[in-house]
Amino acid sequence: MHPATADESMVPSPRHGDGQGGDRPVTPGADVVAAADWGPLAGSRLGVMTNPTGILAGSLINIVDAMVTSGKVDVAAVFGPEHGFRGTAQAGYSEAGHTDERTGVKVYDAYGADPDRLQTMFAQAGIGTVVFDIQDVGARFYTYVWTMYAAMIAAVRSGLNFVVLDRPNPIGGAGRGPMIIDSFTSGVGMDKIVQAHGMTAGELARYFDGELMPAAAGDMLGDRLSVIKVKNWSPKMIFADTGLAWVPPSPNMPTPDTALLYPGTCLFEGTNLSEGRGTTRPFELIGAPYVDGRWAEWLNRREIEGVLFREAFFTPTFSKNADQICGGVQVHIPDPYAVDPILVATEMLVGLKALYAEFGWRSGDSYPGRGFDLLTGSARFREQLEAGAAAEEIVGAWQQELADFERRRRAYLLYSRH
């Protein structure tokens, strides 16, 4: 397959940096377009798929507000993802369709909408171009990229243009983790990518178009897909290097450190431990009423690169183990450039299995461990863990499929990995 074409007038060259920041400011795609007086988006009725992260870096103004105020483009509709356009909803929820009070623009609820439903919304709105501008966090189970995926299928079938206003991947450009297999696709993984894809939304859109759209949609967007690149960004950077304001992409993603750990520690959603929801440090605080100080001691003896574990006690106010005192750990990140979040979580899970007979899977799934399997993309990880495999064995099992993915994605990358 050939990668989807990006208009070179829209894609300034990235900085080939050392991962430590630089003198030239990192400029997201939205700001690139705004600096061009919105010209690349003029002449078409726009449907903007965004949320509170879709801001202009210089003013922190939401792009829909800025577009409407400018009068230079025709914003016909907004399509809100999980948590909603203005970000008022918790995990697993969205904002119902409504008219935005500030701009007067019709807002559609796109969360969980399949391509057929999105096609209907696009037709009702009378749009010619879908514009996607949402800060992703680089993990397969973060739902925004799957809303984009479904919207791309709908755009292919409807003959619409699709523009991604690109933003940095806050955890960098390395691919990590296992590939999903067909029988484990779901709303937290609809198609074939690895657990931490190491791509920006724009790169992922190109990958989706070239690798997945022919089967999923019957055709490609091709030259109807454009990516407006981030200026001066390198995949060697972490988010702190960008100088950009961190706007929480979702209520439980409060800091860039949360994002660094999330591709691994989100796996605890599938267990009987709290993943820190209902605390101020979700995905950093992990624990359960049965956990004691042995877990932190065990983990620190492992000398896992980039992280340290502090024994912690907390009481979640909602979600699993709500209103119960939980023992556990807080994951600290002394070296963010060295962190492999999926290895970190694997070591944590192996330690739990070795130390606590009470360790188990989330209740309420169709079979014990189903939720965990959907997050990892197959039953293999869970079965290895249950069989007592070491972390090295579990991680080693997916290295070939990861290498295959990284080879396939190469043609779609927009920012040098060298």
Give, region by region, the residue ranges found by the protein language model.
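Glycine-rich oxoanion-binding loops at beta->alpha junctions
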Residues: 91-127, 139
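Short internal beta-strands
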Residues: 74-83, 165
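Conserved anion/nucleotide-ligand pocket segment
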Residues: 184-262
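Glycine-rich, aromatic-lined ligand/substrate-binding cores of catalytic
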Residues: 232-316
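N-terminal phosphate-binding or glycine-rich loops at protein starts, especially the Walker A/P-loop
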Residues: 25-73
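Conserved functional hotspot residues or short segments at active or partner-binding sites
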Residues: 287-396
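Glycine/threonine-rich flexible loop motifs
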Residues: 136-148
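Glycine-rich, charge-decorated loop segments at or immediately adjacent to ligand/cofactor-binding or catalytic sites
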Residues: 86-91, 163-185
